[in-house]
Amino acid sequence: MSGLVRLGVILTDRGSKYAVSGAAVASRAEIDSVLNDLKSDKTYAKATHNTWAATLPTGALKADDGESGAGMVILRMIERAELQNHVIIVTRWYGGKKLGGDRFRRVQDATRAYLDHIGVQS
């Protein structure tokens, strides 16, 4: 078990649904374990994008999973909040309409919801 916290679907925009999850991690192997745990749920495995970012003692990591630039949005928010040894995953199920730049605002909204949930100032 990875200690994964799932907030589920927290917002929708023009048919797209966004969820946010996260966990404390100390290594890339633990990030992979958290991602595998999340994707063991078929709903998340079938998502259009599972973008994520993490801070580790060895440095920061991120992945866009096809949602270009989204990992960096999450990473900037994690770094601004000074959250260490943590991964945050923003999941999107595409709703059929392109969101343009609003997709980054939705990623920010989801990340902020997670940070608020764990009691970290964003």
Question: Locations of the language-model features?
Answer:
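Glycine- and acidic-rich phosphate- and metal-coordinating loops
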Residues: 54, 85-94
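Short glycine/proline-enriched loop/turn "hinge" motifs that connect secondary-structure elements
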Residues: 77-83
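Functionally constrained cores in energy, signaling, and assembly domains
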Residues: 22, 86, 98
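C-terminal regulatory domains involved in ligand/effector binding and gene-expression control
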Residues: 1-68, 78, 116-120
